[in-house]
Structures are given as structure tokens and as C-alpha cells.
Amino acid sequence: MDKYEYKLKTEQMLELMEEGSYRKAAELADEIDWRKVRNITMLMNVSDIYEKNGEYQKSYDVLNLAYRRAEGSRKIISRLCTLALKTGNVDEAIDYYDDFTQIAPKDPNQYILRYQILRAQRAPIEQQIEALEEYKK
């Protein structure tokens, strides 16, 4: 796929995304080799499209490409943690959670991620409540 074709497809895909036509946008996204794309924002948008369609593994894979290009991004790490849980990979979610708390030790979103992990692990409700109470502080 040449640059012109890539540009046309991505513009059309983003227009469909803005209109809320995520299924059609995902069909266009499937035609592009995202490993060659360096634009982090584009990769995050594609990940959003796949996530809205319930294609969590594709969303996770594309977001992982963005992570490799911008390793210090709290937003990407947070979303990777959530997507890892949605794909049933709790161990990876814990790894991303640890990365997130190292990068942003004072970010209150860490408590939401902790709660999501505890919930996925079916931890006692007291522990889950404790994580949410920490967020509330």
C-alpha cells in the first residue's frame, strides 16, 4: 500500500469513526498493516475502533505497537492494562499496572486499574472496596 492509498483509507476510516460507524471503520482498518505506522495518535484511534467493536485482541495488539513507540505514555499503559483484562490476560495487566504506578505514582487512576485487576482475580469484595475508597480520597 502506497502513501496515497494509506492516506485515503485512514481519512475515510477516521470520518467513519467520527460518525459512529465503527464496524465499517474496522473493515477499513483491517486492510492496513499497522506495524508500518509510526503515528501514535492513529494507532490509538485504530485501537479505539477495534475496542468499540468488541475486538479486544486486535485493539490490544495495535495499542501494543503504539506502546513500543511511546513507552512512557500513561494513557497507553492504562488502556493496555484494561485491554489485557478484557482479553483475559491478568498477568500482563498486573505488569502494566506496575509500569503505570512507577511512571505515575500519584495518578489516581491507578486505584481504578487496581480495582479492575482485583475484580478480574475475583478477590474478596473488601479488597475491591478498599481500592475504590483509595480512589475516592
Label each PLM-derived region with a short phrase.
Residues 18-19, 52, 86-87, 120-121:
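Register position in tetratricopeptide repeats
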Residues 45, 79, 113-114:
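Canonical tetratricopeptide repeat
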Residues 5-35, 45, 51-52:
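Alpha-helical segment of the N-proximal tetratricopeptide repeat
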Residues 25, 59, 93, 127-128:
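Single-residue signature of alpha-solenoid repeat helices
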Residues 31-32, 65-66, 99-100, 134-135:
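Canonical positions in the second alpha-helix
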